[in-house]
Amino acid sequence: MRKALLLTVSAGLLALLTEAHAQGGVALQGAVSSAKEGAMEGVVVTAKKDGSTIAISVATDNKGHYRFPAGRLEAGHYTLKIRATGYDLDGAAAADVKAGAAANADLKLVPTKNLAAQLTNAEWLASAPGSDEQKKFLLSCNSCHSYQRIVNSQHDADEFMQVFDRMAGYYPGSMPTQPQRLVGTARRNLGGGAGNEMGASDARAGAMKSAAEWLASINLSKGPERSYSYKPLPRPTGKATRMIVTEYDLPRKTIMPHDVIVDSDGMVWYSDFGALFIGKMDPKTGKVTEYPIPKIKEGFPVGTLDLEEDGQGNVWVAMMYQGGVAKLDKKTGKVQTWSVPKEWQTDATQQSFASPTSVNVDGKVWVKNSDKAQIMRLDVKTGQWENFGSFTDPDTKRPIGSYGINADRDNKLYMLDFNANNIGILDGATKKLEVHKTSILRSRPRRGRVDEQNRLWFAEYDGNAVGMYDPKAKSIREWVVPTAWSNPYDVVVDKNGDAWTGSMMTDRVTRINTKTGEMTEYLLPNSTNIRRVWVDNSTTPVSFWVGSNHGASIVKLQPLE
């Protein structure tokens, strides 16, 4: 029978730990081991004080030791948990932390009885039989739920076709506990690109049927046992274990923090993918303030996606199926909205992205309408809109399905083509489009950021890479991330020239030294569904921030070197 580990410190050990605390400033430390491996490196250990909304995590070193620095844990009773695929704690674990003394908590791990429940999306794709093309169908499923829901289902192919039809009618910011239906003729493009232009066709129907048959071959429709073995990823080692992660719980489990940024005052701002709020969190206390956004279209799904700051520090959000954009004046707390002209709207009108970062140049804010992949522009003073329409690849004549959009320093627009491997540059004055291609075919650029040198950094979702377009050289560099099926969603470059990206599939944050090509992958303590990524350059080392879109929390990762 497993013993509950309410951990105390003996008098002899206390003297040693007090000395270690004085030398290294340790609040809580211990060793993690298992009968199978002995000392275990790369185990993520999390401590959460009773009644707190903030959890702190560290990882074990090559000797299996973990250490929580003094100042990160207040005095009190803490529950401990671990993340190490293939293992569970041998009983409940807790520790009492006291001011001025280092507590010790050695943790014993045992093989898990349910490895399948611990697998990430990437590990499911690595484990399941099938071609890469078959598996890529699932890359549009992880925005609403993990693959656990799919692989644990008992649907046959015909039942999966019914599920597909039902899912196509849900708002992308839906979750199992908070579903929202689309309105009228609006339908989602399952397994496709950015825009609805790909639509329904005989070929597409055949592809959906093939996908349904494949999914029925890897789930539990044939019985309680799977025909394939599991392939978990290795735990982090070396530099990747040198981190501290802080996770802040948000006030409701239904909050979906899609985009997270940190302003010059150190406040954390986030968009809510499933509600009409702009959120602010004080990272010192975890206190959350919500600013309601007025509803524009009654009866339509609610939620916001892209969140950006303009030059005056105002916060903007794209209002998705509400058909507009909103701006929060942080000084007054007032929220102002602008609606897309009614004559341009359909049931599928969707403002997922807005780029106000260079509004100071000409007073214009770029806006993307996912319906038909249209590019629009708002004159903030007059409230007048321009519709630039949709664009085509000059080589293939196929529609450019922009996902992310980013204004450069001159307020020209970068368009990231989620249907192919294009980076478009639109000049609002001439309405001319310049197109550059990544060397990785069908890389599907998703989101990105313009740096101080006016270069565009972007994530290549299907390319499993990040790229950088240099407008001076008119060239693109690419870095493939080390773990298969990471599928980066976004990327940002820090003050040192390191590029940071995250995975919706692996729960790992990748740091790329763009000068040497060295890559470090940090494992987060919980399933995080990483989307928009942000780096706070005011700290040394820099701090990485992301919203846990499915976990109702905000996560900060601090590398220790």
Task: State where each predicted segment sits.
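Structural motif
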Residues: 25, 31-40, 73
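Beta-rich, blade/repeat-based domains predominating
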Residues: 253-265, 297-312, 343-362, 394-411, ...
